[in-house]
Amino acid sequence: MAGSFAQLARAADKARDTMLVPKTALETPPLEIHTLGADALRQPAQRIGKVNDQVRELARDMLRSMYTAKGIGLAAPQVAVYQQLLVIDLDLENAATPPLVLINPEITAASAGLDTYEEGCLSIPGVYLDVVRPTAIELSYRDEMGRPRKMKADGLMARCIQHEMDHLNGVLFVDRVTDQAGLQKELKENGFQSKHVQSVS
């Protein structure tokens, strides 16, 4: 029995390692990250029925593209793949820290307390504005091996998860900005058009 347990433990460690890719910029990232104005960003994502090698390779390509763009989170619709898949890494400086892969994530609870914090997005480069979101959340999801998981998150992790999950519904952080004057200014200065914002605030 001990041997079986050890085998399971080694298998779990190996599974975590499958998502470790170099946290360095590539000359040519494997996936194109679409920007504000692209139809891809407004398409809802579908649940993933089976977590297989194809899904894991997509997650790795998303990570490679995210690291190249120096981001901390990326959702599949940002690369024109309409599946419920997110990758997040808040520790870009530590090569040994595995990223978080969330498949079919669902927020099951959110704090009544709200927090205001500046957000940016790889799909809207150069634009940084305050967004109000719940301070803490609880969620369920499947990991890169298809196993059901639950987690609690607060602070930056909670914000990042909520931001990336918005992408799965075709919502961008600029849609939640309440400072319209600041939004117009930031968009104009960075070459984006306000007509592509779909306010949900």
Swiss-Prot record:
Enzyme nomenclature, EC number: 3.5.1.88
SUPFAM superfamilies documented for this protein: Peptide deformylase
Positions of the catalytic residues: 164
UniProt cross-references to Pfam families, sorted A to Z: Pep_deformylase
Keyword Metal-binding listed: yes
Residue runs in coiled coils: none
Superkingdom of the source species: Bacteria
Keywords: Hydrolase, Iron, Metal-binding, Protein biosynthesis
Residues binding Fe cation, per UniProt: 121, 163, 167
Enzymatic reactions: N-terminal N-formyl-L-methionyl-[peptide] + H2O = N-terminal L-methionyl-[peptide] + formate
EC top class, as a word: hydrolase
Cofactor binding: number and manner: Binds 1 Fe(2+) ion.
GO biological process, one term: co-translational protein modification
Required cofactor(s): Fe(2+)
InterPro entries: Peptide_deformylase, Peptide_deformylase_sf
Alphabetized GO MF terms: metal ion binding; peptide deformylase activity
Family: Belongs to the polypeptide deformylase family.
NCBIfam families xrefs: pept_deformyl, PRK00150.1-3
Functional note: Removes the formyl group from the N-terminal Met of newly synthesized proteins. Requires at least a dipeptide for an efficient rate of reaction. N-terminal L-methionine is a prerequisite for activity but the enzyme has broad specificity at other positions.
Name under which the protein is recorded: Peptide deformylase
Gene it is expressed from: def
